[in-house]
Design a protein with these regions (language model features):
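Active-site-adjacent substrate/metal-binding segments within catalytic domains
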Residues: 1-90, 95-104, 120, 173-174, ...
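Substrate-binding clefts and catalytic carboxylate motifs of secreted carbohydrate-active enzymes
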Residues: 14, 77-81, 108, 129, ...
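Short beta->alpha connector loops
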Residues: 25-28, 124-125, 139
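Short loop/helix-cap segments at secondary-structure boundaries that form the rim of catalytic
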Residues: 33-34, 126-131
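Residues that form or immediately flank small-molecule/cofactor binding pockets and catalytic motifs
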Residues: 48, 86, 124, 137-138, ...
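Polar, glycine-rich mid-to-C-terminal structural blocks
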Residues: 102, 133-135
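Extended active-site neighborhood of metal-dependent phosphoesterases/phosphodiesterases
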Residues: 103-113
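Short beta-strand/loop segments at the ligand-binding rim of alpha/beta enzyme cores
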Residues: 113-119
Length: 274
C-alpha cells in the first residue's frame, strides 16, 4: 500500500519517453491518477470486461461505468474513456443487434456524462461508434505493420487479427475513415531473463539477446514511422505480468534495455511528430 509504487511506474514511463498510458482492464486506484496529474502523464480509463453477454452484464457494466466516469472526470490526466476492449463481453457485436445497441448506448451515455473527452467505443477492432479509430495490430509473418495498416484503411472490413475468429477493423454501417487513427496495442515483443523457463506468452519470435530485442523494437517503431496514417501508438507493455513476458521492464521494474536507449527509439523525430 505504498504510493511510491504508483509514482515509480509513471516516472519509468516518462524516462522511456512516453507521454500517455492506457490503463487496461482495471478500475485504476485514485492514487495512481493523483500521481499522473502531479507528474504529468495522460491516461485513458478503461472498464474491465465481462465474459458473457446478459441482462446482468448490461446492468453491472452500466452501473460501474457511470461510477467510474463520475469518479475520475475531475482528473486532468484523464483524456479518454474506454468502455470496451476487443469486443470482450460483447463477443458477437458484429452479428447480434442487441450487443451492438448496448455498445453504442454506452458510447452515448458516456458523452452525456462527459462531453469534453473522446470516447473509444470498442478499442482494438469492430468499431461501431467512437471519437477515435483505434486498432490492435501485432506481428504478422506475411505482412509488415505498415502494409496491414494500409490494407485496413483501404477496407475497414479487413480483419485486424489473424488469430481465431476474424475481427474486422470496423463494423458495416460505421464510417471511421475520417477519424484520427491510433495504434493502441502494438509491439508485444517478448524477452526472458537468462535461465528463465516460464511457459511464456508474447507476439512473434522471442529475441534471444538484449541486442536482438532492441532491433525488434526498432523495427516496429520504423514501421509506425513508415505509415502516414497514425496519430499515436501504445506499446504493449510496460512490465511483464505472469506468463506475459512482453514488458519493456521485468515485473520487478528492472529495465530489459537501458531506459535512455528505449527513449531514443520511442522519441525519434518522426514519432514525436505523430
Amino acid at each position: 500500500e505504498d504510493d511510491q509504487a504508483f509514482k515509480l511506474d509513471i516516472e519509468l514511463c516518462k524516462k522511456m519517453g512516453f507521454n500517455f498510458v492506457r490503463k487496461h482492464q482495471k478500475l485504476e486506484d485514485p492514487r495512481d491518477l493523483f500521481w499522473a496529474d502531479r507528474l504529468g502523464i495522460l491516461v485513458w480509463d478503461e472498464m474491465p470486461s465481462g465474459r458473457i453477454f446478459s441482462s446482468e452484464l448490461i446492468e453491472s457494466t452500466s452501473k460501474q461505468w457511470i461510477e467510474l466516469v463520475m469518479r475520475d472526470a475531475g482528473h486532468p490526466c484523464v483524456v479518454g474513456w474506454v468502455p470496451f476492449n476487443e469486443s470482450w463481453g460483447i463477443w458477437h457485436v458484429g452479428q447480434r443487434p442487441q450487443q451492438r445497441a448496448f455498445a453504442d448506448s454506452i458510447y452515448h451515455l458516456t458523452k452525456a456524462l462527459d462531453p469534453s473527452r473522446p470516447v473509444i467505443g470498442n478499442d482494438g477492432w469492430e468499431y461501431s461508434l467512437g471519437d477515435l479509430w483505434t486498432l490492435h495490430v501485432y506481428y504478422d509473418d506475411k505482412k509488415t505493420l505498415s502494409e496491414k495498416l494500409k490494407d485496413i484503411y483501404s477496407n475497414p472490413q479487413t480483419s485486424v487479427t489473424e488469430a481465431g475468429k476474424p475481427r474486422p477493423a470496423a463494423l458495416p454501417g460505421s464510417n471511421p475513415s475520417q477519424l484520427p487513427i491510433l495504434l493502441t496495442e502494438c509491439g508485444g515483443i517478448g524477452f526472458l531473463s537468462p535461465g528463465n523457463t516460464i511457459d511464456a506468452f508474447a507476439y512473434g519470435p522471442i529475441p534471444k539477446t538484449e541486442h536482438e530485442l532492441e532491433i525488434a523494437i526498432l523495427e516496429v517503431i520504423s514501421q509506425i514511422e513508415r505509415s502516414n496514417l497514425l496519430r499515436g501508438f501504445v506499446w504493449t507493455q510496460l512490465t511483464d505480468v505472469q506468463q506475459e513476458i512482453n514488458g519493456l521492464l521485468y515485473f520487478d521494474r528492472k529495465p530489459k534495455r537501458a531506459l535512455e536507449e528505449i527513449k531514443k527509439i520511442m522519441t525519434r523525430p518522426n514519432i514525436e511528430a505523430l
